[in-house]
């Protein structure tokens, strides 16, 4: 099911056990190199969340949520994207689907997922396809619920001694999603195609949280009774209080997309995409803290409105069957305004406006000769970000300009039994407005979060070597990160709180990664095993104390598919992650056992699938960070264990097409 193509890992879905998975998320879990994060989302090992393309167009979350897995041919995991991709993109998942059939089609899918609480989802897709016209519509409703347990503890070293602050959080989360999508695609001729797409999202959600907080002031005798950060009230100095909060949010968004695809000649083609999106959200968070007969109430509220305009053009010119160039550009404008309010001391009210414009251009050349193929590209991006604080009490305006060039290249050698690829890419990660604004955010009476307007962009340089031999695939990667942005905890002398968290740029970090994958087909059994290890070199001079964060992380997984008679299929997977050192944080090991079973009837029109994740409840993410002033630890337990039943019914088993690209997705994700 897996092979190398140039510098990409290709996963074959059609006519494999993956084609019987009920949803795209179930497929992505089995792609080598993908891993689950603390909140249950998926990311590429060492590269973060991938940007997903559907038939060369940037996909939206709504499109992916109702994508019919059986129509997927293959999925490419590109760890060194070319120059046409945004400079903030770490990895790309490129999903290729089959061509559409003509006729009326439909699909209904429901699932129920049981953990400590239930999540359910219902969706309906209908469409009509002719030789030249495709019209499809989608509606989905999700009632998403999950519980969170998040204990935290901080040992704070201040001038007058050591303080201990702790919180034991229990949260209940609920969100109701109503998502709609309409697509119209018109093939004007063999050379020209146009289309329009509209997406709408209505989200209402909330989080209720109960906390037991505790604190201990410095021991008057100067003795360190809690040097290992373990709770103990033997000395009678530990004090406790309770806190409750309710956070409710509302989001409304609309997104329109227009496209034109043209083939001007045998050697010249173009693609044009235009987008408009509007996003409006608001939330409120009342917090009540009780200690004995004393009670403190805090109310936090915020709202924002954003408009996004964007356009993109891509041109491909063939010089011959073996040589071509791609070039193009994009432009986007994001305008928004918002307001944050808090009744807590030091915070008050902040009104602001954001104005963000981006212009980019790229050029890439592809060629091949015999067993060799290569590509080289250059991308230029200019970004202007303007933040205006409208509050008269504390004006904090700023304007940032970014001008950067991003080179990339790749070279591949194909031999009868071997496949070699060497590639290089540069990327950037620019600080967000929330990190730059200078605002102060309330966490608890002992902790605030402060933004940092002096943050600089993070620049990353990656050199990757990939190889395939028969059933084995391997990868070596060197990564250098300049000015990485991380949290830091400090003890300010000029503010009446005991510690604050903020963002800061750090010096050079280096990572060395090695990866190996093996897969084979034994009749009805398809096993696949992979392992990877990453060693990090990183140290910080923290107020005169040189702290080393060097260390290794490694993980391994073993997937098994069993194809049985009468269209039954079983799967069993195991994964282990040692946690290790990631940035300044050290994680404890986690492991996961999962299984699945599905059965189809009526030539695939009816499918029932069952899956179980984290069978032994071992997906607990324990973290520890040591700094000069603060030792911080927490456990993130998102209750990832679950049992899920999915039922899918299809009418005529056809799928409508929409070939437009969403040029505004990057800006939407930032929101």
Predicted segments — roles?
Residues 1, 24-27, 43, 62, ...:
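N-terminal periplasmic accessory domains that precede
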Residues 4, 35-80:
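Periplasmic plug
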Residues 96-108, 177-180, 208-212, 274, ...:
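Surface-exposed extracellular loop regions of Gram-negative outer-membrane beta-barrel proteins
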Residues 110-116, 130, 141-145, 200-204, ...:
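Transmembrane beta-strands of outer-membrane beta-barrel pores
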Residues 117-145, 161-209, 251-264, 554, ...:
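Transmembrane beta-barrel wall of Gram-negative outer-membrane proteins
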Residues 179-204, 244-390, 414, 418-419, ...:
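Face-selective signature of the C-terminal outer-membrane beta-barrel domain
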Residues 308-312, 358-360, 450-452, 456, ...:
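Outer membrane beta-barrel strand-and-loop segments of large Gram-negative receptors
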Residues 353-356, 397-402, 428-482, 500-512, ...:
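Outer-membrane beta-barrel signature, preferentially recognizing the C-terminal barrel domain
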